[in-house]
Structures are given as C-alpha cells and as structure tokens.
Amino acid sequence: MLTKRTSEKTSPSGKKVLVTRAGDQATALTVALAEIGVDPVVVPTIEIIPPASFVELDQAIADLDQVDYLILTSANAVNAFFDRLVAQGRNPQALSAIQTVAVGPKSAEALFERGVTADLIPKDYRAEGVVALLKDRVSGKRLLYPKAALARDLIPTELTAAGAKVIAPVAYASAPPVDVAKKLQQALTDGLDLLTFTASSTVQNFVDLLDDQDLGLAKRIPVASIGPLTSATARELGFNVIIEPDNSTLEALVTAIRTYFSGTR
C-alpha cells in the first residue's frame, strides 16, 4: 500500500531517512537505502537481549526428538535458538527429522547460514501466514515456536485450536538501547524526510525515548512501515504512515520508499 503523493516528482537523492532497526541488523537496510540515493541516518531504537530465563528454551531443546515442526519467525529467532542450541551442546543435525518453517526470506537465509534449509515458507510473511500454512497439517503434532518476549499469541492459540501441541518458550527479548536519546534528538534537529519502522517495538521505543516537544516534531515527519502490524502501532501512537509495502520485507520497503520519493507509481 502506497498512499498518493500530491507533490511534484522528486528524486531520492539526498533525502534523509531514519533507520531504527537494531544496530547489528541495520546494515542491510542502510546499504539498500544508500543504493537508491537516500542518506540513511542510523539511530537504533531497539536492541536484542537475552530472555529473563533460558529454562523453558533449554527444556525444549532437550526435548527436540519429540518435535515435529520448528517455527522460526525472524532472523532474531533463528539466531537466538541456534545460539542456545550450541550452548546446550547440540548441533543442526538434531533438526534433521524436524520440519522447519521460516517466515520470510530473511529468516530462511539466517537458517541456511546455520546449516539448515527451510522446509516450509508461508506466502504471507506474518504469523497469519504461519497459521494458514500449518493449520490443516498439524493435528496431533508437536510444534516448537521459539518466540520474542512480546510476540503475539496468534500462532500458539490458532495452532493449538487446530489440534497441535505448541511449545512456545521465550528465546529473546528487546529493549531500548542505552544512551541513544540524544542522538535521536540531534537527528530530528538536523532534519529528517522520512522515518522507517520495521517492528512495533521500534515505534514504541522511539516514542519512549523522546520528550513531548521532540515527539511532536517527529510526528510531523512521514513514516514508512514494513507491514500492517507496525503500521497499526504507529498510527495508534499518532504517526502519519504513508508507505507500507505489499510484502513485509526490507527489499519491498526500500522499493516503496524509492517509489515515494520519485513520485511515481
């Protein structure tokens, strides 16, 4: 979805676009934005941290021989799960008899880098896509879904209703980075043409990092959101979402941003 733009055709060149992804994940988006001519301004509003406890995840890893499907909904989930798998003395061969579900190409790529090829990738790169893909094939099956601390309950709820046993340990959490508020304020002062948000948590943390005056300034800047859930959060918090790609991928987001700045359809 791209809303209509009333201004004359312009060029992406020199436009300042805020990147709020986690520091170690911002590179791909930053490079892609630079390639279309914009000036990426990187101020992460989120960092990935360990969960409060690994007890549930460790138990799930110990019981891998009972698992039929492994659901990994992001590169963060892939990395958190495999880091813990290795810490527990296991290796990717432990997954050889398990059907792995990767939500989107980035998750599949992260999985491949760990030595595992995704067996299934839903057409819709969201929790809804996982449910649509699996609901008719998981009755009586045991599913492992290593999730983020603030993940929605859609996958466990819907697939349990479909007859599956869903184990959903928290594999990672997120938090606002320390000492980024001043950098964010400076970016706003210097001027930005577009804000990008790639998760609801990046939006909420952005809001939490700013005082009322700076937040008021920020809300006058148009927003590019990676997908409907992030867009809904941004709108609820008072932002003007004008870009949302049809597919929730970084590539689609960058293409939509280029289209927006070019004033073309």
Task: Identify what each model region corresponds to.
Residues 1-265:
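Signature of uroporphyrinogen-III synthase
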